[in-house]
Structure formats: C-alpha cells, structure tokens
C-alpha cells in the first residue's frame, strides 16, 4: 500500500499543473519511519520510472538556502525528494511549506534597480520528504503533507524478494513507464480534476472530515487510481484495501493537525518565542500584535497575508482588530487582539 500510494503521488505530480489550476494548491508527501525500510530505494525507483536517475536532494547545511531553491526551480511537475531534512541540520525552512503549497515563489528579492522591480524564483515542482522522523511541527505544515509511515515490521520475505527483483531493472528500462504515462497524458489531463473531487467527497463521507486533508490525500490516491484504470493492474480487492488505508491515513492526519485555522495557529505559535516589544505585547491573559512588525519578527512570508488575516478573524481566541495605545506609542496603532491560550491546550 505504501509504495502504491507513493507511486500515485509521483503520477499525480506529472499533472500537478492541471490539479493546481483547479484547486490552487498541491500537497507534499512525507515518507518517514524506521531506517533501512526501503524509503530511499523507493524514491530512487520512482524517479527512475520518470527518467530521473537520482535519489533526491540531500538537505544538509552544506547546501545554501538559495542553492536549494534554485535547484527546485529547475524542475516543473516533477518530484524532488528532500533527503533527511532534519531541523537543525539543514538550511531548509519548513515554514516555506506554507507559501509553496500554493505555489508562491520559492523566493522573492528586490532587483538592483531604483524602481519596485523584483526577482522571483518560481516553484512548480512537488516535494517529497524522506526522513526517519517527521519535522513538521506546526499544524499548518502538517495539514499540507500526506504522511506515509514505514516500519521495519513491514518487511517480509516476500517484500524483500520483490525488492531484489526491482533492483535488477536498469534506469533505461524503468523509464519506459514514464514514457507510457506521457503518451497517455490526455487521459490523465481530462480525468484527474473530476477524479480528485470524487475521491475527496468519498474520503469526507468516510470520516476524513477536514476538506483540505481529504483533498490532499485524494490527489495522491487519484494518481494511482487513474494509472490502475489505464493499465488494469490491481484487483478490486487490492483497490478496496488501498482505499481503506488512505482513509485511515487521512483520519490520522486530522488527529495530528486538528485545526480550522492552521495559518493563524502557526503564526501565534511562532510568536510564543518573541519577547514583548514593537511586534507583540502581553497583558494578563491577552496577546496584542502589530501584524507588520510581527511578520518581520518571525520572518513570515507575505504571500498568504489575505488567508492569514481571514483565519485570524475566525480563530477561537480572536477578540478584535482596532486602533489601540497598548504599545505605548504617541498615537494609536492598529492592533490584533487575542486571548492567550497555549496551542497545546486547544
């Protein structure tokens, strides 16, 4: 089931431009769990299926943040596996997942001119994180990732035998798979949006109540489902088992990323590490923030400002948004007011 769902994500990624055009987002994939359970071999195999003979991009401090983002911009509608991206041992910023989920630029900087010209590094690829331990700490990040766990107890004599057989295929032979997909691209391009919507509705009906999470998991599942319909590969029982597994993954994700306001949750959670000053003030059980200063303090991307402020207003702890003198400045300033409550208690 794990390998088939990962394959589905790779297939869906080839047509991610079609999915994004309709839904305005595309999820990330996380393959995580015990070492020596085949995660690295799986991503190498999947990349070779689509003509890319590489395991992925090692996420280490030897890579600069700009270098990684420029490398990502070289790919479009293809999966880039990020290998062992561990907080503290990589320059990759997991908060970048928030704007990249909506395919905002990986980086925007001012051009060396006197006008308002900017230079952007586009992001049109998809990302898979291959790691022993997941690094997604905020609800907002977790909600945007389809997580597939691997455990050493999953390895059997039969699965090891299949592993050995797959290892015998050359990259040249494996790439015929991707060629077959692209020769039938019209089939996928025509059906993928409706299929994602149908499977998303099914997952919601079966208990994956968070629509965003249902849609993320439906995208990965749709890649497999359309492939299976094209080549008539797996039995109905196999597909039923995989569907049930995907629904369970979605339900598990809801439990680990339970929130209707993930961006606001993440923003307020990051502010917990910012002392009182120009950005934030705390008084009794109240939190006051100046949005512009707070965004600078936590280096929050400006790309999803509208979504962020909309979530602020829906947040359970939101008390108001008005001009106030709480910051002690000569004139009142616009302030967002929240009741203070640790996210762990929500």
Where are these regions (language model features)?
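P-loop NTPase catalytic core of nucleic-acid-dependent motor ATPases
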Residues: 1-62, 217, 228
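Conserved catalytic/switch belt of AAA+ P-loop NTPases
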Residues: 51, 94-118
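Conserved alpha-helical scaffold flanking the Walker A/P-loop in AAA+ ATPase domains
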Residues: 58-81, 85, 116-118
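Conserved catalytic network of the ASCE P-loop NTPase/AAA+ motor domain
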Residues: 71-75, 89-91, 118-123, 137-141
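Conserved AAA+/SF3 P-loop NTPase catalytic/coupling segment centered on the Walker-B
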Residues: 79-101, 132-143
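Structural recognition of the conserved hydrophobic beta-strand(s) that form the central parallel beta-sheet
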Residues: 81-83, 108-110, 122-132, 146-149
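Phosphate-sensing "switch" segment of ASCE/P-loop ATPases
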Residues: 121-123, 138-240
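DNA transaction DNA-binding modules
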Residues: 191-346
